[in-house]
């Protein structure tokens, strides 16, 4: 039923070879296996070695995590080292096309306050940038929402969205993310976006050993007591306060359809022709 309801490849999420084989045998078309890695090495008894013949037999693409025998790769050089090993192994030993390899450089929470997590988002973004430079045809993916773990829902949406935008700019091809947990960049207030960027790139400021600006502390302040609903209501109020023609453009930019029909009726009542609404106002927002 799944195979006939979409033209997109279905992702089978398991590290157990028997589960993957059962899924592949019941699905028509090509699938994506999530995932392979070197957590228990690449020897004959490793999960990697047991999954690959199944993937090869069924022509599946593969999500490959930057995890090796030492653990989950945190800094960019470690991520790149594991990624290069995966790509080399998958292409030379197993004959997998680079376009069928989807590298996950891993996302870690950056709001824990622990020193060792401060640069995790930056390291992931830069690893993606370098990886796409070295292997342009290799695909990349990330589980985006891990980056904001521990924050309140409103803060998570903003951090997820800004992090995703930065990763895409660095070359990210796809993402594992719930659509309700991100928002268009145009909807994010400038101050929230700036501090989120400071947090992602660890732009702390110091006077000697004293931290004079901590983006994490500032980010927490910005969202103290803020709920997703109140954040949306605030944006709706700001939108409603704009002049009609600016409001029409802003609705297009933000992808905000709630209230659009009323604004169009108001524009017609104000004597603006349908053609003018489209050419002079709606198209301006595209």
Give the predicted meaning of each segment:
Residues 1-9, 17-104, 108-141, 145-285:
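ATP-dependent carboxylate/acyl-activation modules
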Residues 14:
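Rossmann-like NAD(P)(H) cofactor-binding subdomain of soluble oxidoreductases
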